[in-house]
Amino acid sequence: ECLDDDRIIEVLLINRSPIDIKHPKINEVIHRDFTDLSSIQHELKNYNACFHCMGVSSAGIKEEQYFELTYTITENLVNVLYNFNPNMTFIYVSGDGSDSTENSKTMWARVKGKTENLIFNKGFKDAYAFRPGIILPKRGVKSKTKLYNSLYVLMRPIIPLMKKMKSVTSTENIGKAMIGLTVNSQQVKILSGSEINQAALN
């Protein structure tokens, strides 16, 4: 969506492995260790927004490891970005059921909620947490989690019905909503699937 939107002039992608998309707007940085961003921090200056979409499934992962991959990595990114770009908008893709009180009995909900609070309390010009339920892939997007891709194939016959569910959004709407909220701020900072879809209309 950023590549198609004339309001976006450059996209910095920080990935562990290269993507197969070539475009004049894209500046791709390959970085393996997200617990230490010191070697690439000079690349993170002078940006208006961060769309933080990195995450892992909690299935089969102990809390200590999930905490490091979810909270600690985000904390490292937030600290570096705030030092260079305190006036940016930071948008975090969290998840439906995340717990801002950090008291949930569900491990991932506590960790996601704590991560949201970290972002909101840092002091960026603006910040949002997206809490989608089901994310429908659009425009050829595929998840790196094989299980999710298999589920999408199985659910394909009922996708038209799923689109009517409030928790359901799409990769396309998430991208459009991120751009829209960067350009036009709103009061609601934690967005459900239906609120993401509404923000995508901006």
Give names to the regions the model predicted.
Residues 64, 68-110, 114, 121, ...:
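Conserved Rossmann-fold NAD(P)-dependent oxidoreductase catalytic core, especially the SDR/UDP-sugar
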Residues 18, 33, 133-136:
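Glycine-rich beta-alpha junction loops
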Residues 1, 79-81, 118, 180:
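A generic secondary-structure signal
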Residues 20, 27-76, 80-84, 99:
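NAD(P)H-binding glycine-rich loop region in Rossmannoid oxidoreductase-like domains
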Residues 1-7:
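N-terminal Rossmann NAD(P)H-binding glycine-rich loop of SDR-like oxidoreductase domains
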Residues 7, 24, 101-201:
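Oxidoreductase cofactor-interface core, primarily capturing Rossmann-like NAD(P)-dependent enzymes
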Residues 13-20:
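Short, polar loop motifs at secondary-structure junctions
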Residues 14, 50-54, 90-96, 130-132:
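SDR active-site strand-loop-helix element
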